[in-house]
């Protein structure tokens, strides 16, 4: 076991691929777990929904619970008009959730602990919301940069402030997710290392404490996917509903 709790976030190359110009596109452990997450989501949806029944199987029940959650979140934040974007929000939620949970498993790797991954997901949300905003509202979408009732003399400053806040959305989304995943996994690693070094691994108290921490980390993994999804729906509301 590595003594450094941050080594679990180290990206390592599984096999090399030809570079594209100056860009390295080697297949890494991060690539593996993103592919694995996508595969598990696709397989679960296929198997769970292949034979829908009145009395759902456990996998179908989980998928339906997630789907109902996405629908209710969109309806409460965006309205009925936002239901056309259920596939987008469902994909984002399930991908983040599965990536978070895979990182908790032994020998797992938490891809959402890397800002490059979380920023890429956040940029997908940012670009999609911006496109949807202009699709629904046209140039009226730019009114988001100027709150209603703003005095004319204050308008230029408010536009700059709101533009900065709008462009900062993907940054705040990505940092929030990555920081929380790093913090949770690091704490578990530190405490587990302390328990092993003190040779008290087989005593009940530290084992129970680690189990509680892992349970808490599962809760955090679900919570962070939930927060990311809710914020995505809030941003969708700005794009779909006129101000």
Swiss-Prot record:
Ranges that cross the membrane: 29-49, 54-74, 89-109, 114-134, 141-161, 177-197, 200-220, 221-241
Main location: membrane
GO cellular component: plasma membrane; proton-transporting ATP synthase complex
GO molecular function, a single term: proton-transporting ATP synthase activity, rotational mechanism
UniProtKB keywords: ATP synthesis, Cell inner membrane, Cell membrane, CF(0), Hydrogen ion transport, Ion transport, Membrane, Transmembrane, Transmembrane helix, Transport
Membrane association type: Multi-pass membrane protein
Subcellular location: Cell inner membrane
NCBIfam families tied to this protein: ATP_synt_6_or_A, PRK05815.2-4
Quaternary structure and partners: F-type ATPases have 2 components, CF(1) - the catalytic core - and CF(0) - the membrane proton channel. CF(1) has five subunits: alpha(3), beta(3), gamma(1), delta(1), epsilon(1). CF(0) has three main subunits: a(1), b(2) and c(9-12). The alpha and beta chains form an alternating ring which encloses part of the gamma chain. CF(1) is attached to CF(0) by a central stalk formed by the gamma and epsilon chains, while a peripheral stalk is formed by the delta and b chains.
Protein name: ATP synthase subunit a
Source species: Ehrlichia ruminantium (strain Gardel)
């Amino acid at each position: 076991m590595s003594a450094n709790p941050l080594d679990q976030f180290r990206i390592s190359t599984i096999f090399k691929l030809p570079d594209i110009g100056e860009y390295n596109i080697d297949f890494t452990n991060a690539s593996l777990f993103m592919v694995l997450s996508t595969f598990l989501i696709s397989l679960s949806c296929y198997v769970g929904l292949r034979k829908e029944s009145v009395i759902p199987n456990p996998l179908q029940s989980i998928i339906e619970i997630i789907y109902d959650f996405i629908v209710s979140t969109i309806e409460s934040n965006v309205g009925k008009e936002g239901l056309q974007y259920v596939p987008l929000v469902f994909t984002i939620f399930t991908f983040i959730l599965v990536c978070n949970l895979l990182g908790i498993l032994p020998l797992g790797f938490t891809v959402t602990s890397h800002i490059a991954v979380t920023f890429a997901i956040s940029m997908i949300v940012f670009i999609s919301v911006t496109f949807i905003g202009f699709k629904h509202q046209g140039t009226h979408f730019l009114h988001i940069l100027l709150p209603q009732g703003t005095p004319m003399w204050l308008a230029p400053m408010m536009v700059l402030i709101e533009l900065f806040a709008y462009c900062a959305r993907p940054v705040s989304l990505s940092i929030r997710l990555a920081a929380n995943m790093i913090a949770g996994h690091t704490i578990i690693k530190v405490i587990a290392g302390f328990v092993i070094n003190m040779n008290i691994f087989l005593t009940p108290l530290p084992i129970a404490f680690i189990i509680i921490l892992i349970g808490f980390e599962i809760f955090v993994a679900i919570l962070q996917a939930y927060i990311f999804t809710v914020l995505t729906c809030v941003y969708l509301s700005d794009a779909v509903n006129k101000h």
